[in-house]
Each structure stands twice: as C-alpha cells, then as structure tokens.
Amino acid sequence: MKSKRHLKILNIIKNEDISTQEELVERLHESGIDVTQATVSRDIKRLGLIKVPDGKGGYKYSLPNEKTYGDIISWLKKMFQDFVIDMDFSENIIVVQTMPGTAEGLGSAIDNAEIEGVIGTVAGDDTIMIVTKPIEKTPEIFNKLQDLLI
C-alpha cells in the first residue's frame, strides 16, 4: 500500500502545484487514499521531495533534479517487483500488466528513467504500453525490464 501511495503522491506532485502537506493529504483523500498528515510528512522525506519556487511567489513540492541514474533504476526495480504482474512484447511495443491503479505512476517512472530505445509510454489503470525504437532493440529492452523483476 505504501508504494501505491508513493506513486500517487509523485503523480499528484508532477501534475499539480502542492504547497502544503495538508493540500497533499486532501488530494490523497480525494483519490480514495486514507492518510494522515504525519504519514504524508514521512512519505515526503522518504521520496526526497523538496520545495521549489512555484513562479507565483510561493513554493511547491517537487522531486529534486539531482537524482542519479542509479537512484532511478533502483527505484524502478522496486516498483517493478511490487507492481508488475506480467510482460510481453510484439514488434516495437512492450505491454506491461500491473496491479490495478499503478500503471500510470510506473509508466511515468519508465519515462523518467530515460531508457535507451524507449521513446514513450501510454498507461491506463493496470496496463502500460511501451513504444521502442528501433524495432531491433525491443527484445533487449524487454530483457532489461524483465531483469528488474529479479
């Protein structure tokens, strides 16, 4: 549940200007996640969120830009192990089946990992479609993603 909550927090932070923990608690409640301000405070620390200027004279939560590639891959590996149910590929498309409610956050994490050959993702509730280029790299990318499950 914690990882699902973390994904939701990252998705909210990415798409909205959240300036207080109370705002974040409210957005999580609106998403059906029951959480306290104390839990959100711990989540913010664990996720490494920082406050940055929002361009309107205030501040908002954000992920630090200094995340290393190794940090991103480690985090992606944990998310794959927690959420991925099955994977397959055809031509230049890799399809990843996930636990319900986790595909969007995981798709965003794949995009942020900037994996060579991945040109983008499309995610629904429990399915991610990863588009690769060139087509010849698809099996190699698929194997790299499968390695994250181990």
Curated annotation (Swiss-Prot):
<dbReference type="Pfam" id="PF01316">
    <property type="entry name" value="Arg_repressor"/>
</dbReference>
<dbReference type="GO" id="GO:0003677">
    <property type="term" value="F:DNA binding"/>
</dbReference>
<dbReference type="InterPro" id="IPR020900">
    <property type="entry name" value="Arg_repress_DNA-bd"/>
</dbReference>
<dbReference type="GO" id="GO:0003700">
    <property type="term" value="F:DNA-binding transcription factor activity"/>
</dbReference>
<keyword id="KW-0238">DNA-binding</keyword>
<dbReference type="InterPro" id="IPR036388">
    <property type="entry name" value="WH-like_DNA-bd_sf"/>
</dbReference>
<keyword id="KW-0805">Transcription regulation</keyword>
<keyword id="KW-0804">Transcription</keyword>
<keyword id="KW-0028">Amino-acid biosynthesis</keyword>
<dbReference type="InterPro" id="IPR036251">
    <property type="entry name" value="Arg_repress_C_sf"/>
</dbReference>
<dbReference type="InterPro" id="IPR020899">
    <property type="entry name" value="Arg_repress_C"/>
</dbReference>
<dbReference type="InterPro" id="IPR036390">
    <property type="entry name" value="WH_DNA-bd_sf"/>
</dbReference>
<dbReference type="InterPro" id="IPR001669">
    <property type="entry name" value="Arg_repress"/>
</dbReference>
<protein>
    <recommendedName>
        <fullName>Arginine repressor</fullName>
    </recommendedName>
</protein>
<comment type="pathway">
    <text>Amino-acid biosynthesis; L-arginine biosynthesis [regulation].</text>
</comment>
<dbReference type="GO" id="GO:0006526">
    <property type="term" value="P:L-arginine biosynthetic process"/>
</dbReference>
<keyword id="KW-0963">Cytoplasm</keyword>
<dbReference type="GO" id="GO:0051259">
    <property type="term" value="P:protein complex oligomerization"/>
</dbReference>
<dbReference type="Pfam" id="PF02863">
    <property type="entry name" value="Arg_repressor_C"/>
</dbReference>
<keyword id="KW-0055">Arginine biosynthesis</keyword>
<comment type="function">
    <text>Regulates arginine biosynthesis genes.</text>
</comment>
<comment type="similarity">
    <text>Belongs to the ArgR family.</text>
</comment>
<dbReference type="GO" id="GO:1900079">
    <property type="term" value="P:regulation of arginine biosynthetic process"/>
</dbReference>
<dbReference type="GO" id="GO:0034618">
    <property type="term" value="F:arginine binding"/>
</dbReference>
<dbReference type="GO" id="GO:0005737">
    <property type="term" value="C:cytoplasm"/>
</dbReference>
<keyword id="KW-0678">Repressor</keyword>
